[in-house]
Amino acid sequence: MIYIDNRQNSITVDENLQNTIREVIDYALKEEGMKISYEVSVIFVDNETIREINRENREVDKVTDVLSFPMLEYGEGKVFKDIYEECDFEDEYFDEGNLVLGDIALSLERAEEQSKEYGHSFLREAAYLTVHSVLHLMGYDHMVDEDKIKMRKREEEILSHFDINR
């Protein structure tokens, strides 16, 4: 189950955008080994709102493009597909039979700005940021170079399925 909640007025949210976000999330999760029903919540926000969320949750008082709030914890250097087969998730991780993976806050305003900066479509930028965030929900990180390389490679592999390349 993918919930999308539009909490901004800066960018028009049409059916194509919502469908693309849903398809990208579903495909990325399946590629990462998701074999059971899941739940991901996505909120579309503006720059000021994502700045507030960033400040409240990370103590970073600046605008960012996307924030991920994973519900599951993974061991150091582990991602979902590394632990899924041996993991017995407790009831607290489920809601109505769906494994709750976490929340994504996506600034559509910042995605629009970045699409212009990088010279590609808004839809491509929104899709990229969604894949990036989903991978965080699945345990990927980019704090050290080795992990960053692994994550970037995975992002591009997933996006290539949609013919949405950089």
Curated annotation (Swiss-Prot):
EC number of the protein: 3.1.-.-
Superkingdom of the source species: Bacteria
Cofactor: record remark: Binds 1 zinc ion.
GO molecular function: metalloendopeptidase activity; RNA endonuclease activity; zinc ion binding
Binding-site positions, Zn(2+): H132, H136, H142
Compartmental location: Cytoplasm
GO cellular component: cytoplasm
EC class: hydrolase
Main location: cytoplasm
Family matches, as InterPro entries: MetalPrtase_cat_dom_sf_prd (IPR023091), YbeY (IPR002036), YbeY_CS (IPR020549)
GO biological process, one term: rRNA processing
The entry's keywords: Cytoplasm, Endonuclease, Hydrolase, Metal-binding, Nuclease, Ribosome biogenesis, rRNA processing, Zinc
A Pfam family matched in the record: YbeY
Similarity annotation: Belongs to the endoribonuclease YbeY family.
Protein name: Endoribonuclease YbeY
